[in-house]
């Protein structure tokens, strides 16, 4: 089974993806993780992606589609998977339908103010990559990781002005996509402002529902 998680940055897609992946043995394919992996490894695409995200812009379709397709090809044929953050527009959706038809589409709904608060407070450990939040998951010592004592940092694209740019572009690009899936009755909306356990229950219900 394939699941597609749609929603703005900070809507909880990544957190829920990891929970579902661990409990139900799904592969979690996150475009954000794939981008960061390429940036970290300084691949040709990674260098290009880094310049784009630091400006608060969305990565072009041709790059995103290639990275996602390559990842899916590396997965066993009958394994379950979650696509987190892909597709993001009609072009990507059409590409997805060509090589992965009949996936279930789940859209995470959340207001912009809550997204900005969640992401502007996010801090990441430079050493072990654990994620904390100064508002919801603060460390015992300011700026220091609770796990490995490494230094924490804030991603450039998590700063408020950059977030506003990202959210504006997200809305412009994904509105037609949401309408596209709504018209063909494939869209399952989930309130992402509630507690994680509540979101999880709703996702499982959708997973069990027949197409």
UniProtKB/Swiss-Prot annotation:
Chain segments carrying region LID: 121-158
Source superkingdom: Bacteria
Catalytic activity annotation: AMP + ATP = 2 ADP
Pathway: Purine metabolism; AMP biosynthesis via salvage pathway; AMP from ADP: step 1/1
Annotated InterPro entries: Adenyl_kin_sub, Adenylat/UMP-CMP_kin, Adenylat_kinase_CS, Adenylate_kinase_lid-dom, ADK_active_lid_dom_sf, P-loop_NTPase
Positions of region (NMP): 30-59
Keyword flag ATP-binding: yes
Residue sites binding Zn(2+) per the record: 125, 128, 145, 148
Pfam entry (one): ADK_lid
GO biological processes: AMP salvage
Binding residues for ATP: 10-15, 122, 131-132, 194
GO function terms (MF aspect): adenylate kinase activity; ATP binding; zinc ion binding
Binding site for AMP: 31, 36, 57-59, 85-88, 92, 155, 166
GO cellular component: cytoplasm
Its EC number(s): 2.7.4.3
Subcellular location: Cytoplasm
Keyword terms of this UniProt record: ATP-binding, Cytoplasm, Kinase, Metal-binding, Nucleotide biosynthesis, Nucleotide-binding, Transferase, Zinc
Family assignment from sequence similarity: Belongs to the adenylate kinase family.
Annotated domain remarks: Consists of three domains, a large central CORE domain and two small peripheral domains, NMPbind and LID, which undergo movements during catalysis. The LID domain closes over the site of phosphoryl transfer upon ATP binding. Assembling and dissambling the active center during each catalytic cycle provides an effective means to prevent ATP hydrolysis. Some bacteria have evolved a zinc-coordinating structure that stabilizes the LID domain.
Assembly notes: Monomer.
Entry function: Catalyzes the reversible transfer of the terminal phosphate group between ATP and AMP. Plays an important role in cellular energy homeostasis and in adenine nucleotide metabolism.
Entry protein name: Adenylate kinase
Species name: Borrelia garinii subsp. bavariensis (strain ATCC BAA-2496 / DSM 23469 / PBi)
Organism placement in taxonomy: Bacteria, Pseudomonadati, Spirochaetota, Spirochaetia, Spirochaetales
Encoding gene per record: adk
């Amino acid at each position: 089974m394939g699941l597609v998680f749609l929603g703005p940055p900070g809507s909880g897609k990544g957190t829920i993806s990891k929970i579902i992946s661990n409990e139900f043995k799904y592969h979690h394919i996150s475009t954000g993780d794939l981008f960061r992996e390429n940036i970290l490894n300084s691949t040709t695409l990674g260098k290009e992606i880094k310049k784009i995200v630091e400006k608060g812009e969305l990565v072009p379709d041709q790059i995103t589609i290639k990275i996602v397709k390559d990842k899916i090809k590396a997965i066993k044929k009958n394994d379950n998977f979650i696509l987190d953050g892909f597709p993001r527009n009609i072009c990507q959706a059409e590409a997805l339908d060509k090589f992965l038809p009949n996936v279930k589409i789940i859209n995470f709904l959340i207001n912009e103010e809550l997204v900005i608060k969640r992401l502007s407070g996010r801090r990441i450990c430079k050493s072990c990559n654990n994620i904390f939040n100064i508002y919801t998951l603060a460390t015992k010592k300011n700026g220091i990781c609770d796990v490995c004592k490494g230094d924490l940092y804030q991603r450039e694209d998590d700063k408020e002005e950059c977030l506003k740019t990202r959210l504006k572009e997200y809305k412009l690009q994904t509105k037609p996509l949401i309408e596209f899936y709504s018209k063909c009755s494939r869209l399952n909306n989930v309130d992402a402002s509630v507690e994680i356990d509540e979101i999880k229950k709703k996702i499982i219900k959708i997973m069990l529902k027949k197409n």
